[in-house]
A protein has these predicted regions:
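Hydrophobic anchor at the beta1->P-loop junction of P-loop NTPases
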Residues: 5
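The conserved Walker
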Residues: 9
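Conserved lysine of the Walker
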Residues: 13
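Intrinsically disordered, low-complexity terminal tails and inter-domain linkers enriched
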Residues: 42-62, 120-164, 193-195
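Phosphate-binding/switch loop-helix module in NTP-utilizing enzymes
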Residues: 91-130, 162-166, 171
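Hydrophobic positions on the alpha1 helix immediately C-terminal to the Walker A/P-loop
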Residues: 16
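N-terminal phosphate/diphosphate-binding loop that engages ATP/GTP or pyrophosphate donors
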Residues: 21-100
Length: 242
């Protein structure tokens, strides 16, 4: 089963997914892939958002503003600075006009080296999937075993589990429109259900949902859309048999 977690920007999808991963681990389901938590700071009183901030998905209300995005690799917990708001990168002289995100006109300045690191992680997960399909012993990269994901998924120490869930947070315009970004995650998803990863959950913004369905349905069949709420938790747990 392929679940698509969707909703508008800044509706708590990643926080919901992190809590779900912790709960599933406690119930015997291993989550492997990537989470994309935001980097935030308190908003100055009366401060307005820039055009770049709004383009990046910021909102004019709220006590915090989003400065960037990290990636947390699951299950090892490695945390990678992944993206910075484009206007902040320009102001710091760190904006790379040749980067994938710049060429795509995104509101985030995404580090191509960070993309490469996440892709390497998914290549290793694909190797695990291949070993499992051939009847070999599948192990997650860098881990001797798997264990329960605590409330902070970045602190995971994992032990063997009977069921695995592939997690991709998130698929955006780079992946779904331009064929760039997390290409190794897309390649793994294109395999459909495998012995190592019979189920997957991807995060996709609502405006990209039709493209995601067209792209992934051939491998997975019907995609099940869920929201970051208790009903979504129940649907995932039911499909996983927990």
């Amino acid at each position: 089963m392929l679940f698509v977690l969707t909703g508008e920007v800044q509706t708590g999808k990643t926080r919901w997914l992190g809590r779900l991963a912790a709960r599933l681990a406690a119930e015997g389901v291993r989550c492997a892939g990537v989470l994309a938590p935001g980097v935030w700071r308190p908003r100055a009183e009366g401060a307005a958002l820039s055009a770049e901030d709004l383009h990046a998905g910021g909102r004019a209300e709220g006590a915090f503003e989003k400065l960037g995005i990290d990636n947390v690799l699951l299950p090892c917990g490695e945390r990678i600075p992944f993206a910075r708001r484009a206007d902040l990168a320009r102001a710091a002289g760190a904006f790379d006009c040749a980067s994938q995100s710049a060429r795509a006109g995104l509101g985030w300045a995404i580090d191509d080296a960070a993309i490469a690191r996440v892709n390497a992680h998914f290549r290793e997960l694909a190797t695990e999937a291949g070993a499992a399909a051939e009847g070999g012993e599948a192990k997650v990269p860098g881990e001797s075993g798997f264990g329960a994901v605590p409330s902070d998924p970045s602190q995971a120490v994992l032990r063997p589990f009977a069921v695995s869930l592939l997690v991709v947070d998130e698929l955006g315009r780079l992946e779904l429109v331009r064929g760039e970004g997390l290409i190794e995650a897309m390649a793994l998803l294109d395999r459909g259900p495998t012995p190592a990863f019979p189920h997957a959950l991807v995060v996709v913004r609502e405006d990209l949902l039709p493209i995601a369905r067209e792209r992934l349905a051939p491998a997975w069949g019907v995609l099940r859309s869920i929201r970051p709420d208790e009903e979504g938790v129940d649907q995932v747990r039911a499909a996983l048999g927990v």
